[in-house]
Structure formats: structure tokens, C-alpha cells
A protein has these predicted regions:
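Acidic donor-binding segment of Leloir-type glycosyltransferases
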Residues: 1-39
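The conserved acidic donor/metal-binding loop of glycosyltransferases
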Residues: 66-70, 94
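Conserved nucleotide-sugar donor-binding catalytic segment
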Residues: 107, 111-188, 195
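Short aromatic/hydrophobic "clamp" motif used to bind/position activated sugar donors
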Residues: 62
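Conserved short acidic donor-positioning loop in nucleotide-sugar-dependent glycosyltransferases
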Residues: 13-17, 44, 67
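Acidic donor-diphosphate engagement hotspot in glycosyltransferases and nucleotidyltransferases
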Residues: 21-22, 50, 71-76, 101-102
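Glycine-rich, basic loop-to-helix element that forms the pyrophosphate-binding segment
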Residues: 40-57
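Conserved donor NDP-sugar-binding/catalytic core segment of glycosyltransferases
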Residues: 74-105
Length: 199
């Protein structure tokens, strides 16, 4: 909520069977009418939850923020200005990797541009850094049902339509937790084989 650019809506897809923080979120919704909360009746996974959020969104642009991550206060303003000034439809930024205490342990730099062939070699795109035009998402181009790498699959599909542009400024923080799906080496390996076999 603490962004210098304030013309946005927040769509929270609650996909956790543990309801420990749902009341807090609903209280925030009462205070700020820009917030919409959708609680899934059953766990459908991150990819399908994001698709659901995108489908009910109203804006021209879509940005993502996972629950463990956080944005720099100027992220939306700087990134949207960059996209409008350069007439591009997909952008991402550098980001800091932090531990459970919030300490920066490394910085991931964003390359200036990524094309499909580059993306197959290495995905340097942090999900919570991405802003894209909603028109890029449709029934044949959306998040798949994978436990990990679902964002990688979508970026591959989009990179066949347009180049992906990076901003080498850290505008987000990604929290690395040892028990998170994004940190699960074996699950990432399995899903990685599935992705590469398909593309």
C-alpha cells in the first residue's frame, strides 16, 4: 500500500488452508476499498490462483507480489514510467535476496533484455519484480499447474510474443526460506525437466 504511485487495485487470492492471517487481511480490506480478497475453497496452487486474480482484474497492467516478498515504495512508479516511456509491454527489475531475518544475502541483477532463446538457458526474472500488460494473458497463455517454475513457463510463452525488458535497479526483495517451494531443489528439478521437454 505504501507506493508513490497510488492508482492501483490489490487482488489477494487466499490459497492457504491455514487461516491464521485471514482476519488481518479482511480488516485491511474494510479500511481500503482497493483491496479485493478471494478465498479459495480448496488449495489450487500458486499458478491457478494467479490466473484467477488476473481474470477479475480491471487494470491495463498486472504486477505480482508473493506473500513472502516486498516492494520498494517507488517500484510501481519507476517501472510503469519506464514501460510507458519505452513503449514496452513486459518489464522486470533487479532484486535483493533476503533471509528470514530480512538481511540481504545477495543481489540478482536484471539484464537489459531477454528473448526466448536466452530464457531457455537461464531465467533471471523474479516473479515479484514483473509488470506486464494484461493483454498478454489469455486462455492459451497463462500460468500452468506446476508446483514450481510456473512463472518460467508463462515467461517462455510471452517471450514468443514480445521481448522482456529489465531494469537494473533493485525494486523488490525476495525472501529465501529453506522450506519454501521455490527453494525445493528436487521439485524444481522435476518441474524443470517437464518444462524443457515441452519447449
Amino acid at each position: 500500500l505504501n507506493q508513490t504511485f497510488q492508482n492501483f487495485e490489490i487482488i489477494i487470492i487466499y490459497d492457504d488452508l491455514d487461516l491464521f492471517d485471514l482476519d488481518y487481511i479482511l480488516e485491511k480490506q474494510k479500511i481500503d476499498k482497493r483491496i479485493t480478497v478471494i478465498k479459495n475453497n480448496k488449495n489450487i496452487g500458486a499458478g491457478f490462483s494467479r490466473n484467477k486474480g488476473i481474470s477479475i482484474s480491471n487494470g491495463k497492467y498486472i504486477a505480482f507480489l508473493d506473500c513472502d516478498d516486498c516492494w520498494h515504495p517507488e517500484k510501481l512508479e519507476k517501472q510503469l514510467n519506464f514501460m510507458k516511456d519505452n513503449k514496452i509491454s513486459f518489464s522486470f527489475t533487479s532484486y535483493d535476496v533476503i533471509n528470514s531475518k530480512g538481511e540481504i544475502i545477495k543481489n540478482k541483477k536484471a539484464p537489459k533484455k531477454i528473448m526466448f532463446k536466452n530464457l531457455l538457458i537461464d531465467c533471471n526474472i523474479g516473479l515479484s519484480t514483473v509488470i506486464l500488460e494484461k493483454r498478454l494473458i489469455n486462455d492459451s497463455c497463462q500460468f500452468p499447474n506446476l508446483k514450481t517454475k510456473e512463472d518460467f513457463v508463462l515467461w517462455l510463452k510471452i517471450s514468443k510474443k514480445t521481448d522482456l525488458y529489465g531494469i537494473d535497479v533493485s525494486l523488490a526483495k525476495w525472501r529465501k526460506l529453506n522450506n519454501s517451494l521455490s527453494s525445493n531443489f528436487f521439485q524444481k528439478l522435476i518441474d524443470g525437466f517437464r518444462v524443457y521437454n515441452r519447449y
